[in-house]
Amino acid sequence: MSSYALYRGTTLGQALDKTLEDMESEGLLTKSLASKVLQQFDKSMNKQISRLPKEKMNFCATQLLTYRYCDNVWTFILNNVTLKDPQRSFDEPIDKLKVVACDGRQTSLLQTLSAQGPSKRVNRAHAAAAGDDEDDDSD
């Protein structure tokens, strides 16, 4: 079963990654075991997030800076965003907001991966490893 690696860029994900790198450099952990830990982190985060209550939040942005749709994942970068939520109040607008939306149904993810075939998955993996994603640092 595949999981999206969206949450590795969060504070928690970055701290885990840094800790695993430190443990690897000290010889306490192998690279393959660190990779398994990150894969389990991805699965666990996706599972826990799906259990959260589904609350609606409204937002309004003055500008849609960029958008992208790739592999059933939408990514939007918005400028000057005002959030409205029935339970909370937000006093000031957010300068920049990145929204990543993906299909949470695992069957569609697996169908997409199998439809791409192994060569496309490998090419995308090489592109991602080469730093082809320009929006990763805009969180």
UniProtKB/Swiss-Prot annotation:
GO terms for cellular component: transcription factor TFIIA complex. One of its GO terms (biological process) is RNA polymerase II preinitiation complex assembly. The keyword Transcription applies. Gene3D superfamilies: Transcription factor IIA (TFIIA), beta-barrel domain (2.30.18.10), Transcription factor IIA gamma subunit, alpha-helical domain (1.10.287.190). It is found in: Nucleus. Belongs to the TFIIA subunit 2 family. This is Transcription initiation factor IIA small chain homolog.
